[in-house]
């Protein structure tokens, strides 16, 4: 089942943000598209916060307590389980 997921993020320098919508049908595709989104829109090396939204479901994350310029691959293990729960709840 295909899901439309809205993504928003801001980057560490505080100078901007990115947003967009992806349409995916599996968690692996969601993870791949999320990573691509960060690379394209948020400058992967400086993600400060992000949120994903679908219907009434949402997941928000920030790295304000982490050193600046952490990329998503540095924190993926801590958010992957929560994102999978979010994705499965999204209709």
Residues of each region from the PLM?
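Short intrinsically disordered terminal tails
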Residues: 1-4, 84-91
